[in-house]
Amino acid sequence: MLRIFPIAAPTSFTSDFNEGRSGGRLHAGNDLFAERGAPLVAVDDGQVRSGRDPLGGNILNLYANDGTRYYYAHLDAFADGTATLIDPPAPRMARAGEIVGFLGNTGNAKTTVPHVHFEIHPGNGPAIDPVPALQSAPRMSDPRVMLAGTASQRNVLVTVSAVTLLSLGAWALLYPNDAQALIRRLGV
């Protein structure tokens, strides 16, 4: 179901779908934990719409071409580097593996450790348990992902040193503009 795992960094998670939350609500997704600022990537090709929500803080919705909506919440910043939105930007297209934001703890998560709340809504309907899809999703370090680009991108992968692959991740080779944005954000 997911073409790529939503975080391009070491991540931990457990199944917390449908667990009780404050105000009598149920947890409609899963919390994925990683370092603050870890790159969040599009799990499929589709349209990205970012915004702000009292519970989710900085949020984005990815509307995949098959009608599935993927919801990401508590972002530290969006891919364009903005941390807050006064006027939501126009929707934009993203490819699977492209950076769409950075992990944080905004909204009602400001007193928690950094994480992304992630939901899957097939047909833009009710949320389903994302754990099975997350467990089977390829990670950025997976050879299937690293070889998924065009012939010229695959040639670059073959010639790049292992150190570069480990330090920047395979997505940096497939999405060099995103890699440069991350480098600017990290100040390296």
PLM feature spans:
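Acidic, glycine-rich catalytic/binding loops that coordinate metals and/or anionic ligands
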Residues: 1-12, 33, 68, 81-98, ...
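Short, solvent-exposed coil/turn segments
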Residues: 6-7, 25-27, 35, 55, ...
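Short glycine/threonine/proline-enriched tight-turn/helix- or strand-capping micro-motif at secondary-structure
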Residues: 11-45, 72-73
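A structural signal for short beta-strand/turn segments enriched in small hydrophobics and glycine
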Residues: 13, 40-42, 46-48, 89-106
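Residue-level detector of conserved, well-ordered beta-strand and adjacent loop positions
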Residues: 14, 33, 63, 73-76, ...
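A generic structural motif
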Residues: 17, 36, 52, 76-79, ...
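Zn2+-dependent peptidoglycan hydrolase active-site motif and core
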Residues: 42-89, 109-119
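Short hydrophobic alpha-helical membrane-entry/anchor segments
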Residues: 155-159, 167-186
